[in-house]
Amino acid sequence: MGEKSVQKKKFILETARKVFVEKGFKKVTMKDIVEACQISRGGLYLYFDSTSQIFLEVLKLESEEADDVFSGSIREDATSADILILFLQEQKKELLRKENTLTQAIYEYYFEFHPTKKDNILKIQFDSAVKIMEMLIQTGVESGEFYCEDCKGMARNIMFVLEGLKISAQTIGITAETVDREIAYILKSLDA
């Protein structure tokens, strides 16, 4: 794919993201994306076959960008505790963000399509986050920053708490105080 095609595809994905944020997943059609991008229907189908394919590409792009932002925020001399606190603070920002979020669209997509474990990007991201969190906690235990007898169990628990907070943010609403309380509980559990 040439540079012009790469840029066009990225433009479509960035524009489609805005459409998914506004309408969720279920209500978005290829026509909506064509109109938002101001391109021909054929021009869109040159790159994508369906709204599902576009949505999954939007999620991948979003994940890559979030990883880049987080990685760029970590100091060279950061300790395991510093990294964990930075990660939890980034999660807090995301949880409290009221606008420009794909959370509703993500849940609509997964409730509608029930992807298998193999192609479920949320499951893949969750499992990857658990592994990274487990390594981070293990490193913190080895350096004496944390105390934890079951690093994998703690990592899984942290990710389930964050996922529960995401759902709560979309359904019943949460406050900064609620998120701070949960973060404090996580840190206390590690004696951080």
Where are the language model's segments positioned?
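Hydrophobic alpha-helical connector segments
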Residues: 57, 61, 71-98, 154-158, ...
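Helix-turn-helix
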Residues: 11, 15, 19-53, 57
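Amphipathic alpha-helical segments used for helix-helix packing
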Residues: 95-117
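Hydrophobic/aromatic residues within well-ordered alpha-helical segments
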Residues: 8, 51, 58, 62-66, ...
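Amphipathic alpha-helical packing segments from all-alpha helical-bundle domains
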Residues: 64-67, 116-142, 156
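N-terminal intrinsically disordered/low-complexity leader segments
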Residues: 1-7
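C-terminal peripheral helix-coil segments that are non-catalytic and often amphipathic
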Residues: 86, 90-93, 131-142, 161, ...
